[in-house]
Each structure stands twice: as structure tokens, then as C-alpha cells.
Amino acid sequence: MYDNPLEISFLSLFTLITFFIFLIIQKFSKRIFDGKLLDNNFDKPQAFHHEEISRCGGLASIISLIIFIYLHNFFFSKIFYEYLIIAFGLFLVGFLDDLKINIKPIFRLISMMLILSASVAFFSIDIERVDLIFLNIWMKNEYFLILFVLFCFLFVINGSNLIDGFNGLLAINLLAINLILAVINMQNDLFEYLFLLIAQIIILITFLLFNFPKAKMFFGDSGSYLFGSLTALNVIYTNNFNEKISSFFFCVLL
């Protein structure tokens, strides 16, 4: 049972902080970067809006996440470095596109691969087991392991970016995945990691309030890259922490 009073109070405070961050950024979105984050393309197939909508969802999310990590370190002396570096790095790649800076897709992909490869190697992020014997054998090779983890990240990130476009679709999908991961970790008493998952769920729910059913804010590429990378990391760690659950389950979940 998750009943730590201090952490519950902290999450309640974080919920309020997150809501006001989204509210303030949404209200002043026209002044942020001279309105470059406003979506005024009404002719694209997935456009259901007829007025300028802010693509500041990613910006509000990364600010909320950074505040959570900082405050968590302040109160509990624990900082999630890999989450901070990967999330911020992938956010920046998408944020440049949100600012309408023309970067060729191949350069975006290369940037993502470099950030992820460096993070995977530096933080020793690995997939400890899969339910395929030959893959377990191959993953004993350090270079193959890095490539395989990199592929998993890119699969989730680009999948998130692909389904982003309809109000609430990406947020609801990511919310469902992370809620299932949270339940799994709660049942196995992995409360420290559960704490981080709940913080991400709070950010997703807050964004959903501004995105569905009538959008006042979009994720943008920065938001889909950010939460795609976070969700990939969440799934990898949950797979590693819960050996009794088949790795095929997590593949199907995604």
C-alpha cells in the first residue's frame, strides 16, 4: 500500500504546481518566442481547430518534470539523472522543430541517436532479459545491446510522434501505458520508482485537461519526443524490475 504521508503531500503540491505551469504557459503562449509556438496551419488533415493553438505542451511538461526532479532531490536526496538528461535532450530536438526551425529529418534522427546512444552507454541502461533465448545471448555483446536499446527508444519515440495529431489521442495512449506500469510496480512494492511514474501521470493528466476534448494546447514534437523517451525508459525499467512478467507483455503494451 502506497501510504507515505510526505510523498503523498509532495505529489499533491506537485499537482498544483504542474497545473499552474500549464495554465500560465497556455495563457501567455502568444508572447513566448514571439508566437512561434502557435499552430496556425488549419489545412493539415488532422487539423480540427480554426484558431491559433499553442504547441507549448512539451515546454510545460519539461518545466514540470525538471521542477519535480529538483524538488525530489531536495526533499528525498534522490535525483533521476538518466530521466533528466534523456528527457531534456529529446525535448530540445523536438523543440527546434516546434519553433519552425527547418531541420532535415535525417539530422533530427541523427541527433536523437547520438543523445540516446551516449545516455544508454553512460548510464548503463540495458534490457536485462527478453523471452527470446537468442536475443539474450546476443545482448551479452555490449555493442549489440546498445543498438537494441537504441532501437527500442526510437520505436516508441517515433510511434508517439506518429499518433500525435488528434486531440487527446497520444496523451490517453501514454496515460494508459504508464498507469499499467504504475500498477505493476505498486503490486511489487517498487514505491520509489512508482513515485516517478505518478509524477509523469500527473503531467499527462494535466496536459489532457488542456488538450481534450477541445484543444487549448498541443504537445508539439517536443512533447511527443519527450514523453516517448520517458515511456520507453519506464517500460525498460519495469521489465527489468519485474522478472515474473513476460517481456512479451511489455511489447504488446506498447
Q: At which residue positions do the language-model features occur?
A:
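Alpha-helical transmembrane segments
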Residues: 2-31, 38, 61-89, 170-254
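Cytosolic, membrane-interface loops and tails of multi-pass inner-membrane proteins
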Residues: 27-54
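A short N-terminal beta->alpha junction/helix N-cap motif
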Residues: 16, 20, 50-51, 55
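Short clusters of hydrophobic/aromatic residues that line enzyme substrate/ligand-binding pockets
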Residues: 48, 130, 217
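Hydrophobic/aromatic positions within or immediately flanking transmembrane alpha-helices
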Residues: 54, 145-148, 197, 218
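Intramembrane alpha-helical segments
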Residues: 59-188, 202-212
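Short capping/connector residues at structural and topological boundaries
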Residues: 53, 58, 135, 222-224
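Short, Lys/Arg-rich N-terminal segment immediately upstream of the first membrane anchor
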Residues: 1-8, 50-51, 136-139
